[in-house]
């Protein structure tokens, strides 16, 4: 609730709308709490748009790199705003979208060709990006039903980064601002991090309002809502050693349950342990009680390390990874059929409620046949191959 309160306060003081990005957090059983503080969400797929409409109770602000013939109508019906990634996608679908939802607000994603995100995997403005329209490719007069621009350039960034990025956005795209009604500055604004300068962000937005008073401002953070609110509690199931490297194997998996750790990569904080930076991951640092932590999948690279503990790890004791709520539950996979950790919530009175337990049926149902009138070409190809 602290994160929700801060996001609502920033939105009110800066006179903008802050909405939740489902790509980072989509635990719908907690939506009643969220609805006390925010009124909208952002989606990037049909499933997320339906979750917004049916579970959050409001239509989504939707963006996708590429909409499809077999989903676009239902996406439009579940969306209040729909942003196209390219002018070709706009030309292909804008009339169809309006037929499906006459009240929808349309936008274009633009590429300011500037981002300070250092990891290429997460940099939406890197050379060759598939995201957005650059200024040199925009027509001088926008299509009459385009009401807004969407820019996404950040990843767990500070207000100072947004200030510098905004200068590039204005330099490249302000000539089109008089034709717009709203602008969405995307996600990656980590307002709830301790060192985030909230006052500076508010002043930046107020200055933008003074320059462009007709534009409604939207931000759609994800991590800022779930930041430091959910640890992953695992247990040590074995300790093995090879070539001087001790590995504590846990009953969870980096590749299945914490994929961002391997993708970025980054070392998650472990409670009551010191994270050790090493130049050569094949050699253990010197000292006592130093461990790699290994996952319980068959992937050779399902490990990270090293961490230094203040004692010998014992089979059965907890290893707790901090800040594991965002970009985990939405990205878990069933590689190896590894069971997912249960999901729970601690209420204000201290009571722990289990929101979700996972079982064999969750794994099995991924390959279970479902009859549906709407089938994607992927489904049809798979069925044809099986029938042959």
What is each model feature region?
Residues 2-6, 168:
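A non-catalytic, amphipathic alpha-helix used as a structural packing/dimerization or gating element
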Residues 6-16:
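A short, Lys/Arg-enriched amphipathic alpha-helix followed by its capping loop at the start of a domain
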Residues 16-182, 196, 204-207, 211:
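Active-site-proximal beta-alpha core segment in soluble small-molecule metabolic enzymes
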Residues 112, 241-242, 377:
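Short, conserved beta-turn/loop elements at beta-strand boundaries and strand-helix junctions
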Residues 114-116, 155, 191, 225, ...:
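Feature marks short, surface-exposed loop/turn motifs that line or immediately flank catalytic pockets
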Residues 152-154, 183-192, 221-224:
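Glycine-rich beta-strand-to-loop/alpha-helix junction loops that act as flexible
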Residues 204, 219-368, 372:
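Charged (often Lys/Glu-rich) extended helix/loop segments that serve as interaction or gating elements
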Residues 369-388:
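Single conserved hydrophobic/aromatic residue that forms the stacking wall/gate
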């Amino acid at each position: 609730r602290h994160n929700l309160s801060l996001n609502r306060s920033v939105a009110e003081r800066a006179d903008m709308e802050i909405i939740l990005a489902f790509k980072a957090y989509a635990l719908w059983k907690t939506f009643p709490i969220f609805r006390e503080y925010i009124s909208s969400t952002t989606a990037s797929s049909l499933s997320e748009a339906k979750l917004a409409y049916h579970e959050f109770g409001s239509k989504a602000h939707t963006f996708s790199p590429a909409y499809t013939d077999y989903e676009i109508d239902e996406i439009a019906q579940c969306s209040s705003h729909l942003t196209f990634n390219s002018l070709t996608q706009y030309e292909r679908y804008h009339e169809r979208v309006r037929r499906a939802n006459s009240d929808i607000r349309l936008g274009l994603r633009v590429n300011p060709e500037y981002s300070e995100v250092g990891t290429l995997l997460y940099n939406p403005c890197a050379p060759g990006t598939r995201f957005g329209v650059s200024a040199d490719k925009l027509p001088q007069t926008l299509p009459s039903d385009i009401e807004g621009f969407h820019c996404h350039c950040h990843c767990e960034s500070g207000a100072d980064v947004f200030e510098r990025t905004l200068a590039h956005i204005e330099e490249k795209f302000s000539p089109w601002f008089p034709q717009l009604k709203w602008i969405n500055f995307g996600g990656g604004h980590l307002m709830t991090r301790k060192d985030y300068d909230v006052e500076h962000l508010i002043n930046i937005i107020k200055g933008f309002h003074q320059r462009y008073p007709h534009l409604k401002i939207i931000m759609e953070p994800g991590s800022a809502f779930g930041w430091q609110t959910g640890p992953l509690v695992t247990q040590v199931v074995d300790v093995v050693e090879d070539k001087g490297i001790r590995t504590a194997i846990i009953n969870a998996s980096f590749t299945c349950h914490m994929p961002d750790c391997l993708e970025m990569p980054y070392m998650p904080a472990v409670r009551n342990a010191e994270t050790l930076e090493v130049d050569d991951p094949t050699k253990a640092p010197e000292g006592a009680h130093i461990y790699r932590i290994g996952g319980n999948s068959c992937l050779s690279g399902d490990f990270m390390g090293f961490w230094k503990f203040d004692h010998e790890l014992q089979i059965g004791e907890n290893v707790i990874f901090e800040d594991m709520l965002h970009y985990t539950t939405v990205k878990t996979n069933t590689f190896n059929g590894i069971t997912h950790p249960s999901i729970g919530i601690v209420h204000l009175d201290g009571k722990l409620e289990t929101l979700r337990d996972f079982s064999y049926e969750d794994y099995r149902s991924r390959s279970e046949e479902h009859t549906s009138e709407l089938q994607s070409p992927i489904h049809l190809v798979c069925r044809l191959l099986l029938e042959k």
